[in-house]
Amino acid sequence: MAVQQNKKSPSKRGMHRSHDALTAPALFVDSTTGEVHRPHHISPNGMYRGRKVVKAKGE
């Protein structure tokens, strides 16, 4: 098992973890229905870029 040579200070530990933060997902408002969904994904009602591409649940 690997063993560290020198102790990593709290400052260096924080710098090492600086890229681990989570970001909120980008959201897109559909211009036709006003529903919010992720960009490049199908909206919950089955619309993509203003066209109906799949049947929504319950149709």
Curated annotation (Swiss-Prot):
Disordered: annotated span: 1-59
GO MF, any single term: structural constituent of ribosome
Xref: InterPro entries: Ribosomal_bL32, Ribosomal_bL32_bact, Ribosomal_zn-bd
Keywords: Ribonucleoprotein, Ribosomal protein
Entry's Gene Ontology cellular component terms: large ribosomal subunit
Superkingdom assignment: Bacteria
Keyword Ribonucleoprotein attached: yes
Record-level GO BP terms: translation
A matching Pfam family: Ribosomal_L32p
Biased composition (Basic residues): 49-59
Similarity comment: Belongs to the bacterial ribosomal protein bL32 family.
HAMAP family recorded: Ribosomal_bL32
Name of the protein in question: Large ribosomal subunit protein bL32
Species of provenance: Neisseria gonorrhoeae (strain ATCC 700825 / FA 1090)
